Amino acid sequence: NLCERASLTWTGNCGNTGHCDTQCRNWESAKHGACHKRGNWKCFCYFNC
């Protein structure tokens, strides 16, 4: 089961899901990451709950 959290290391709009995914995995030890529009485009990281 994965839990979503806004990235703590991403700044600005998220326009590249691949980069968001790499940054979440490499910098925040997440399982993966993706860009989602929540007001504006943000990078969200996904972790084991």
UniProtKB/Swiss-Prot annotation:
GO terms for biological process: defense response to fungus; killing of cells of another organism. One of its GO terms (cellular component) is extracellular region. The keyword Secreted applies. It is found in: Secreted. It holds the Pfam family Gamma-thionin. Disulfide bonds join 3-49, 14-35, 20-43, 24-45. SMART domains: Knot1 (SM00505). Keywords: Antimicrobial, Disulfide bond, Fungicide, Plant defense, Secreted. InterPro entries: Scorpion_toxin-like, Scorpion_toxin-like_sf. Possesses antimicrobial activity sensitive to inorganic cations. Binds specifically to the fungal plasma membrane. Has no inhibitory effect on insect gut alpha-amylase. Belongs to the DEFL family. This is Defensin-like protein 1. It comes from Clitoria ternatea (Butterfly pea). The lineage of its organism: Eukaryota, Viridiplantae, Streptophyta, Embryophyta, Tracheophyta.
